[in-house]
């Protein structure tokens, strides 16, 4: 699994967003992308980012948006919102293969393989997916999954030690 750890400054994203049920999101999010591209009003906004808000008020749903950095667009078009992403350290995973299967498979690998064994802990805030303007159905299509992380803190006999 190819990844890198990077520090990013805070940023604002312009997103067309909707709430999704956790249990049905894997099938519903690809439909949301189809709707995004089918609507001419949204063709004016480049869709090279997806953002998933992990701060949940209801554990069974989350907010997911499609869009771009707000600095790339003037104003906020109807149907869009600005999402402020704080400064974080990010784990950035390279994903290769056709969408949506490649990105869904990589999420599964991150959650089952990387997170349980890495020295990093996921910060439950915003996750990002970066998409290139190439053909997303291509076998060699490249995208990225970016999750905010921090070094895990280990406890030893009533003493807290921060991993460096």
Residue positions per predicted region:
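A solvent-exposed interaction/effector surface
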Residues: 1-164
């Amino acid at each position: 699994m190819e990844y890198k750890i990077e520090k990013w400054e805070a940023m604002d994203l312009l997103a067309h967003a909707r709430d999704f049920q956790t249990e049905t999101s894997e099938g519903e999010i690809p439909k949301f992308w189809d709707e995004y591209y089918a609507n001419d009003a949204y063709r004016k906004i480049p869709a090279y980012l997806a953002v998933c808000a992990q701060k949940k008020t209801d554990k069974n749903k989350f907010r997911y948006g499609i869009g771009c950095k707000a600095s790339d667009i003037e104003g906020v078009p109807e149907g869009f919102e600005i999402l402020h992403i704080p400064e974080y350290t990010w784990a950035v995973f390279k994903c290769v293969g056709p969408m949506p299967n490649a990105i869904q498979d990589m999420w599964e690998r991150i959650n089952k393989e990387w997170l349980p064994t890495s020295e990093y802990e996921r910060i439950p805030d915003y996750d990002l997916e970066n998409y290139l303007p190439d053909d997303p159905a291509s076998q060699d299509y490249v995208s990225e999954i970016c999750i905010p992380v921090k070094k895990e803190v280990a406890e030893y006999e009533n003493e807290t030690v921060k991993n460096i």
